[in-house]
Amino acid sequence: MSSIEWRVSEGLTDYEYARSEMTKRVADIANQEASEMLWFLQHPPLYTAGSSADRRELLMPDRFPVYPAERGGRYTYHGPGQRIGYLMMDIRKHGNDIRRFVHSIEKWVIESLAEFGVTAYSHPERIGIWVDTPDGEAKIGAIGIRVRRWISFHGFSLNICPDLEHFSGIIPCGISEFGVTSLHALGKKVSMSDVDQALADRFPYFLEALQSKEAF
């Protein structure tokens, strides 16, 4: 863990700046000129379009800035009250299995949520982190990873206390039949730093899972 830099940015981080920083860091890691990094931050309100985004799923194109993202997936929302975790890691050093890497991120976030009494789960047909609510299944976290020269970038988002109405400008991840929720909406009034600590506590288990040979 000591070889992986942890960076936590206060306030709101411009998306274009974050993308530029990730691109540079990925190149530096690939060239063995920088350490791996986990970057926790928040963005101002915006939508991002993954490589599979369908323009028809952008319901309010003028509501917030829309940025193309180099990750997989479709449209998603980022904004204040949402913890973004960008992972710039050399997958060759951590199991050399991209599929396992993605599923291990899901497991890491799910186990971190359990520390707040939230039972979350992944779904075999819908990527992301899900919970059951009185209104049915709802998404509380999203996963979107890109890999370049075996170095990961982008990562996950976890809804702590964002304005959930902001998701109405898109069909999140192309899934219209399920809603979105947050820790606060579930009655868990935790802070951003509480969530960061839970993720840090579970991070060694995430690294162990990357090396596991167990099937998903």
UniProtKB/Swiss-Prot annotation:
<protein>
    <recommendedName>
        <fullName>Octanoyltransferase</fullName>
        <ecNumber>2.3.1.181</ecNumber>
    </recommendedName>
</protein>
<dbReference type="InterPro" id="IPR000544">
    <property type="entry name" value="Octanoyltransferase"/>
</dbReference>
<feature type="active site" description="Acyl-thioester intermediate">
    <location>
        <position position="173"/>
    </location>
</feature>
<keyword id="KW-0963">Cytoplasm</keyword>
<comment type="function">
    <text>Catalyzes the transfer of endogenously produced octanoic acid from octanoyl-acyl-carrier-protein onto the lipoyl domains of lipoate-dependent enzymes. Lipoyl-ACP can also act as a substrate although octanoyl-ACP is likely to be the physiological substrate.</text>
</comment>
<dbReference type="InterPro" id="IPR045864">
    <property type="entry name" value="aa-tRNA-synth_II/BPL/LPL"/>
</dbReference>
<comment type="pathway">
    <text>Protein modification; protein lipoylation via endogenous pathway; protein N(6)-(lipoyl)lysine from octanoyl-[acyl-carrier-protein]: step 1/2.</text>
</comment>
<feature type="site" description="Lowers pKa of active site Cys">
    <location>
        <position position="139"/>
    </location>
</feature>
<dbReference type="GO" id="GO:0033819">
    <property type="term" value="F:lipoyl(octanoyl) transferase activity"/>
</dbReference>
<comment type="similarity">
    <text>Belongs to the LipB family.</text>
</comment>
<feature type="domain" description="BPL/LPL catalytic">
    <location>
        <begin position="32"/>
        <end position="211"/>
    </location>
</feature>
<keyword id="KW-0808">Transferase</keyword>
<dbReference type="GO" id="GO:0036211">
    <property type="term" value="P:protein modification process"/>
</dbReference>
<dbReference type="Pfam" id="PF21948">
    <property type="entry name" value="LplA-B_cat"/>
</dbReference>
<dbReference type="GO" id="GO:0005737">
    <property type="term" value="C:cytoplasm"/>
</dbReference>
<feature type="binding site">
    <location>
        <begin position="155"/>
        <end position="157"/>
    </location>
    <ligand>
        <name>substrate</name>
    </ligand>
</feature>
<keyword id="KW-0012">Acyltransferase</keyword>
<dbReference type="InterPro" id="IPR004143">
    <property type="entry name" value="BPL_LPL_catalytic"/>
</dbReference>
<dbReference type="InterPro" id="IPR020605">
    <property type="entry name" value="Octanoyltransferase_CS"/>
</dbReference>
<feature type="binding site">
    <location>
        <begin position="142"/>
        <end position="144"/>
    </location>
    <ligand>
        <name>substrate</name>
    </ligand>
</feature>
<feature type="binding site">
    <location>
        <begin position="71"/>
        <end position="78"/>
    </location>
    <ligand>
        <name>substrate</name>
    </ligand>
</feature>
